[in-house]
Amino acid sequence: VMPRPAKKIQDIYFFFYGTGYKKALYDFSLLAGKIALPPKFTFGVWWSRYWEFSDVEMKNLVEEFRLHDVPLDVLVIDMDWHLVNRPEWFNDKGERLDDQAGESCGWTGYTWNRSLFPDPEGFLKWTNENQIQTCMNLHPASGIQPHEDQYTEFATAMGIDPATKKYVPFDITNKKFAQNYMDIILHPFEKLGIDFWWLDWQQWSTTNVKGVNPTFYLNYVFTSDKDRRGIRPLIYHRWGGLGNHRYQIGFSGDTKICWPSLDYQPYFTATASNVLFGFWSHDIGGHMNPDGYDPELYTRWIQWGAFSPVFRTHC
């Protein structure tokens, strides 16, 4: 992607429909694209939690669902699937250091945490054999750091001498970087059995190309990559602005654990239809700042989750 020379011209669209709400939305879809239909399994039960789960614990979890005759369709593996807490990433006070990109060490990662997943190939074979769709979390802002298993191959592909141990900055607007990112980093995980990604971008809002929003463009690149390979696109992502209804499942977290938060979610979900956004995935049960767990709050949240677009527990 690159900037185009712009003259003093601006396109302005006026929509006048009175009470013709459905007609307005239909015409907006002609302009901004149709809502992509997610695969059938996305309307089943998702399980996720921010915790250091091992492969054995996740297998036991799946068996617990079956023992109690509760369906489970999607297993979301949060960021601890990769290296997060190496000793050299902390100072003497136990404070986390920054990496070469200026981000927190361990926030971005592509190297399996073998203490939790000693046999990732075997684990993903097991999930596939048990008809569990697997999604993994990505925080890509730190680029490819020197400790990663893929660093030497990736740095070489980008024209960086691996001996320098210089990280490869993340630049999704660079076609060469984007292609190598898919081919060298992500596609091998998908061949192992990862079904789709939780693209958890939460850093800067601009790119090297003026006017290009990184959240929006990431959603586009991830979706078009699968489309080009003849794979039905599916992405679980953060909202990047108008037009993101083309990229299926939205992540609304990180939700506070409180009654007002639950009270707001039905309104928030319903009004998203005003911009054709139909598939929010909420942190059912909440995620942040618990003031003590309230069993009734959790029960009511589960009830709402059953009627929300995507039923993903997270508490």
List where the protein language model places each region.
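Catalytic-domain carbohydrate-binding cleft regions of carbohydrate-active enzymes
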Residues: 1-315
